[in-house]
Swiss-Prot record:
<dbReference type="InterPro" id="IPR027409">
    <property type="entry name" value="GroEL-like_apical_dom_sf"/>
</dbReference>
<feature type="binding site">
    <location>
        <begin position="479"/>
        <end position="481"/>
    </location>
    <ligand>
        <name>ATP</name>
    </ligand>
</feature>
<keyword id="KW-0963">Cytoplasm</keyword>
<dbReference type="InterPro" id="IPR027413">
    <property type="entry name" value="GROEL-like_equatorial_sf"/>
</dbReference>
<keyword id="KW-0547">Nucleotide-binding</keyword>
<keyword id="KW-0067">ATP-binding</keyword>
<dbReference type="GO" id="GO:0016853">
    <property type="term" value="F:isomerase activity"/>
</dbReference>
<protein>
    <recommendedName>
        <fullName>Chaperonin GroEL</fullName>
        <ecNumber>5.6.1.7</ecNumber>
    </recommendedName>
</protein>
<dbReference type="GO" id="GO:0140662">
    <property type="term" value="F:ATP-dependent protein folding chaperone"/>
</dbReference>
<comment type="similarity">
    <text>Belongs to the chaperonin (HSP60) family.</text>
</comment>
<feature type="binding site">
    <location>
        <position position="415"/>
    </location>
    <ligand>
        <name>ATP</name>
    </ligand>
</feature>
<keyword id="KW-0143">Chaperone</keyword>
<feature type="binding site">
    <location>
        <begin position="87"/>
        <end position="91"/>
    </location>
    <ligand>
        <name>ATP</name>
    </ligand>
</feature>
<dbReference type="GO" id="GO:0051082">
    <property type="term" value="F:unfolded protein binding"/>
</dbReference>
<dbReference type="InterPro" id="IPR018370">
    <property type="entry name" value="Chaperonin_Cpn60_CS"/>
</dbReference>
<dbReference type="InterPro" id="IPR027410">
    <property type="entry name" value="TCP-1-like_intermed_sf"/>
</dbReference>
<dbReference type="GO" id="GO:0042026">
    <property type="term" value="P:protein refolding"/>
</dbReference>
Length: 546
């Protein structure tokens, strides 16, 4: 085991503080409407220019192991805030820096670190409760667009396209962000249920110009096993041919003679048919087949419930208004399932989302919920260059998270004003002893730091602005974009309450941990002798090439 370097007390905390400040100073430059740009060097290609705090934080690694620990802990603040609300990472970093700097000064002056932390925790809980009281529901498209605009660094077009997407697919709908091919942002909405499986054979295509298979008013046969024997399918095919309607088969797979026979029947026009693999794998595939069954009013043909293909009748088949199959996707439009059953299924999936602890499972359940309850919207980000595209896409994703958070827990006045107003909750708050009171006072100063930083980035005087905002009340604040004072909500400067709350909680949590740090352990740097060049015999004239 490699030898370790151990530092204690003040010398450890000083090193950690250097790392905290290096990372936070780089990140906080991006805060607010007049946030500065940060240029990130890349090992290949052009450097990236960004105003996204997380992208800056991810790039920073320090040479000194102890300083690096401080930087990594602040990174943790940003990622905690990001995990909770999807945004507010820069605000969280600014708050954490203020808490750590003030806290370590107090510890150096002889205060008890544990009591300081208790004071900070007490004050944080009171401010969080006050933020809940201050929040207003975010119901209409205008408010959603404003939240998106603020989160996307004051880009109106991004706020508006997100509001439009939310309006079209509902609050439960899935909105994905992709790189577009044009200069402008585009929004496309998929009606009905879409899953990422395409037709099993190009011979099913009946619209050669667009290479899709379209079935009007089809019946849907849902099977949870492979179909390779055509004899199993014959009874259903005959019944469908008599009914004179097209058929879509969704099964684990259709192969061999079964697929060949379907293709021949389709080409001869005996039965209009198409086959597609069921989406997902394992248990998720079964669940998604059941979703399609509920949506179309059909039943999954499964031996687990005593149904086989030979005994399947038209009653077991689902119905839809239209089905479109492309090479990659299948879309079922206007399924004929009963509303009550769809609602029951939605309720069941919601309960599973509440219970699951896995982020991956939650995301997949959310997708299933959207396909049943809402729809799917795709925002295609347009830009002039690759560098701009990456930067813009990151901003759209941030804005999307922020608007979701706003719909969930409401909005508060932006620009750091909500935290200043929430100070009312801790003006008279007292701890159990003097050291706890110092912790409370320390948080009182720290919550002003986002407002001060936004002002500083805009080139104005932080103390003057902070003082004037504190003298005001309600939504009164400072619009750094225009340099005007006024009602923040009316000026359209809103923050999701969840983002502000998560930022403060993450900052207080990591800040408290750093203040109570007493020792740090890191690997000692190894002294390696400079390695000579290996012999490259037989390659005359190319010595020393790496």
């Amino acid at each position: 085991m490699a030898a370790k370097d151990v530092k204690f007390g003040d010398s450890a905390r000083k090193k950690m503080l250097v790392g905290v400040n290096v990372l936070a100073d780089a990140v906080k430059a991006t805060l607010g409407p007049k946030g500065r740009n940060v240029v990130l060097a890349k090992s290949f290609g052009a450097p990236t220019i960004t105003k996204d705090g997380v992208s800056v934080a991810k790039e920073i690694e320090l040479k000194d192991a102890f300083e690096n620990m401080g930087a990594q802990l602040v990174k943790e603040v940003a990622s905690k805030a990001n995990d909770a609300a999807g945004d507010g990472t820069t605000t969280a970093t600014v708050l954490a820096q203020a808490i750590v700097n003030e806290g370590l000064k107090a510890v150096a002056a002889g205060m008890n670190p544990m009591d300081l932390k208790r004071g900070i925790d007490k004050a944080t809980a009171a401010v969080v409760a006050e933020l809940k009281n201050l929040s207003k529901p975010c119901a209409d498209s205008k408010a959603i667009a404003q939240v998106g605009t603020i989160s996307a660094n004051s880009d109106n077009s991004i706020g508006e396209i997100i509001a439009e997407a939310m309006e079209k697919v509902g609050k439960e709908g899935v909105i994905t962000v992709e790189e577009g091919s044009g200069l402008e942002n585009e929004l496309s909405v998929v009606e009905g249920m879409q899953f990422d499986r395409g037709y099993l054979s190009p011979y099913f295509v009946n619209k050669p110009d667009t290479m899709v298979a379209e079935l009007e008013g089809p019946l849907l046969l849902l099977v949870d096993k492979k179909i390779s024997n055509i004899r199993e399918l014959l009874p259903v095919l005959e019944a469908v041919a008599k009914a004179g309607r097209p058929l879509l088969i969704v099964a684990e797979d259709v192969e061999g003679e079964a697929l060949a026979t379907l293709v021949v029947n389709n080409m001869r026009g005996i039965v209009k048919v198409a086959a597609v693999k069921a989406p997902g794998f394992g248990d998720r595939r079964k669940a998604m087949l059941q979703d399609i069954a509920v949506l179309t009013g059909g039943q999954v043909i499964s031996e687990e419930i005593g149904l086989s293909l030979e005994t399947a009748t038209l009653e077991h088949l689902g119905n839809a208004k239209r089905v479109i199959l492309s090479k990659e996707n299948t879309t079922i439009i206007d399924g004929a399932g009963a509303d009550t059953e769809i609602e029951a299924r939605v309720k069941q999936i919601r309960a599973q989302i509440e219970e699951t602890s896995s982020d991956y499972d939650r995301e997949k359940l959310q997708e299933r919920l959207a396909k049943l309850a809402g729809g799917v919207a795709v925002i295609k980000v347009g830009a002039g260059t690759e560098v701009e595209m990456k930067e813009k896409k990151a901003r759209v994703e941030d804005a999307l998270h922020a608007t979701r958070a706003a719909v969930e827990e409401g909005v508060v006045p932006g620009g750091g004003v909500a935290l200043v107003r929430a100070l009312a909750a801790i003006v008279d708050l007292k701890g159990d002893n003097e050291d706890q009171n110092v912790g409370i006072a320390l948080l009182r100063r720290a919550v002003e730091s986002p407002l001060r930083q936004i002002t500083a980035n805009a080139g104005d005087e932080p103390s003057v602005v902070a003082d004037k905002v504190k003298q005001g009340s309600g939504n009164f604040g400072y619009n750094a974009a225009t340099g005007e004072y006024g009602d923040m909500i009316e000026m359209g400067i809103l923050d999701p309450a969840k983002v502000t709350r998560s930022a403060l909680q993450a900052a207080a949590s990591i800040g408290g941990l750093m203040i109570t740090t007493e020792a740090m352990v890191a690997d000692l740097p190894e002294d390696k002798p400079a390695a000579g060049m290996p012999d490259m015999g037989g390659m005359g004239g190319m010595g020393g090439m790496m």
